[in-house]
Design a protein with these regions (language model features):
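Catalytic-loop of the protein kinase fold
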Residues: 132-154
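Terminal C-lobe "cap" of eukaryotic-type protein kinase domains
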Residues: 276-302
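Conserved structural core of kinase catalytic domains
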Residues: 69-120
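Conserved C-lobe activation region of Hanks-type protein kinase-like domains
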Residues: 201, 210-266
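Activation segment/activation loop of eukaryotic-type protein kinase catalytic domains
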Residues: 146-184, 188
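ATP-binding glycine-rich phosphate-binding loop
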Residues: 1-41, 66-69
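Conserved end of the kinase activation segment
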Residues: 189-200
Length: 409
């Protein structure tokens, strides 16, 4: 057993703290908090030992791509005075990576120096699907699969998964406890229940992440009520009721968000999405299926991707999603301008417009909240509004326009 010196880097989570390993730049150590009860620590020790002995075979990486770590996987135990304290894992270079969450909005990606196009997004989706498939082949599931726990190498587009000691293992030789879950990525059959089918849960979360990556961050269960049925305000409630508005067959109860570009997706991708969100646990697309379908679009020499007249990458035979999105943004700006003209010309008619807006035509929570404020302020004012009130309303709507433009961008 080798003695090492650990140096704190000031990063601590719910279960433990991360340290660098002196003279070992490729590795870091996670030390569990001393406050963890002994029974829980013993469970961690059994799990980490199993993981060290059963590392999954990961997707091959070209030899020219040095230093890419796809899993922060345990490689050795850390013992303190003959007692289990934590584990050593390979270090992910945070300087070369960014949170996958940043790819859900182009502005955040640009702030990270990453120029987003649909070729890169599809490649990230493909690499993530391959990685999840490797885990499932070893009967390991992430369960709490979500963008914030994923890193993307900016140049190579490979994906890394953090917090591997939180994975759920369901092999014949060892079964671990199911981890905590995030409601926005939780399959409908597991709401208010334990996750009894971890791979099915991963399949749902994987499809959700892929949909969001390809659709400018829009969640697959974000939509607009199409009738007067009770419509949950929380995404988890919509997931539980199966209110998915982006299928090839339209839903009678909910409409797609106007900012969505899902109709620009190829049929093969839309079919996997529909199966993942509408067909139940048994028919949900596997990580292997996703990897197979996405592989042709991720290839640089693929004829399944083409360029539009403006030079944007698009799916061959489909409309350009970037051009469609630009049109949506321009249309939104024009509608805001027309509303300001209407407001100044006839405040009473503008109130009617805002009331109608609040009943289901809003495309974002920012607009809805702003419209409610706007409605209250207009109702309290006389029909002939003072210059001060008009100026206040203009300021409010200008702020709303900026916020909404940022959200759509």
């Amino acid at each position: 057993m080798e003695k090492v010196r650990l140096l704190s880097i000031g990063k601590s989570g719910g279960a433990g703290e991360v340290f660098t390993v002196e003279d070992q730049p490729r590795y870091v150590a996670k030390i569990y908090h001393a406050s963890i009860r002994e029974s829980q620590r013993a469970q961690y020790a059994r799990k980490i030992r199993w993981m060290i002995d059963n590392k999954p075979e990961l997707p091959a990486i070209p030899t020219e791509y040095q230093g890419i770590v796809q899993l922060a996987w345990p490689v050795a135990l850390v013992m303190k005075q003959a007692s289990f304290a934590g584990f050593v894992m390979e270090k992910i270079d945070f300087g070369r990576t960014m949170e996958l969450d940043y790819l859900l909005t182009r502005r955040q990606a640009a702030d990270e120096g990453f120029d987003v196009d649909f070729g890169k997004l599809v490649t990230v989706c493909h690499n993530l699907a391959c990685l999840i498939d490797c885990l499932h082949s070893k009967r390991i599931a992430v369960v709490d699969l979500k963008p914030i726990n994923l890193k993307v190498y900016k140049s190579e587009l490979y994906v890394s998964i953090l917090d591997c000691d939180g994975f759920h293992i369901y092999s014949d030789s060892f079964v671990s406890e199911a981890p905590q879950v995030t409601p926005e990525y939780l399959a409908p059959e597991f709401h208010e229940k334990a996750v009894t089918q971890p791979e099915a849960q991963d399949r749902f979360a994987l499809a959700t992440i892929i949909f969001r990556l390809l659709n400018y961050g829009i969640h697959p269960f974000a939509g607009i009520a199409a009738n007067r049925i009770p419509y949950p305000t929380e995404l988890s409630g919509r997931i539980k009721l199966g209110l998915y508005p982006y299928g090839k067959l339209p839903s009678a109860n909910v409409r797609a968000t106007p900012a969505s570009v899902h109709e620009c997706f190829p049929d093969s991708i839309r079919e996997l999405l529909d199966r993942s969100f509408t067909s139940g646990t048994g028919a949900r697309a596997s990580a292997y299926e996703w990897a197979a379908v996405l592989s042709s679009f991720a290839s640089k020499s693929s004829a399944d991707m083409s360029r539009c007249q403006k030079g944007h990458l698009q799916f061959a035979g489909k409309s350009c999603p970037c051009c469609l999105r630009e049109g949506i943004l321009r249309g939104h700006v024009e509608r805001q301008k027309r509303f300001m003209v209407r407001l100044q010309a006839s405040p009473a008619r503008a109130v009617t417009y805002v009331k109608k807006t609040l009943k289901g035509t809003q495309t974002s929570p920012f607009q809805a909240a702003l419209a409610q404020v706007q409605l209250n302020s207009v109702q309290l004012a006389p029909v002939t509004m003072s210059i001060r009130n008009v100026a206040s309303i203009e300021i409010l709507w200008t702020i709303g326009l900026i916020i909404t433009f940022w959200w759509l961008k």
